[in-house]
């Protein structure tokens, strides 16, 4: 999500362009509209420092009703259609009442810190620098989003304000820890009479259905997978590094003040590396052949978007008439590579 790289405290405003206005400026790629995010700039005056921080708590709103372990045992034992094997299975671990939704969900605590400083150097070089840190835990256990951001903005003016410059640079580092969302489905359907872990040394200690109810027996191929093992036996993370920079020059020609020249150059670069490791003992991928158990998948992508826009605009009022003409050139190069 491109917006995940934007620090909300750096945003000054949102502008939405749609219909012909967006297409006229950005071409066919803007046929569905354009959202322009304007970030905060420096201001003339003495240095001012701002800090903001918050702690948030997230929790699930509702819980799916399912039988407890005791309710499920009673249901099977008193069911005239239950087989001997079914009755034996629910009595393997007497007294166990596992709430699988509680085992995979949590009350998540997240923190965010932002600090910025802005001012100007001798009234002609306004600046703003900012740093931000976000650590967001997900409601699903093991999931996490961590982000570092840093930005610099310079907006100097020269030649009696005839030349305005807008220089921006932003660096972003994001670390994602992904959780297997299949655990949510499994938590609503896995047997509540079974423990999270049992006395086995074959499936990482996690309860796993076997063909003969032996904790170290042969895994039953058609049975569901322990939802907690889906979370704790898989390490799926990615690291994203991004740089966004642009330089804009707006010049009101000295000898012809009705003529403005505007140049904007920018680059958006992102590189992401991911690593998904599944433990060989993971019940979901376990095989009797150790060489065919578990997995390790490395993935990456690299994206680079460069842009150059130049236009000249002449605007003049003649009595009751307004004359406005614009000519420009736009160049964009997009590169994407992945495995």
For each feature predicted by the language model, list its residue ranges.
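Short, glycine-/polar-rich solvent-exposed loops and beta-turns at beta-strand/coil boundaries
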Residues: 6-9, 26-31, 143-146
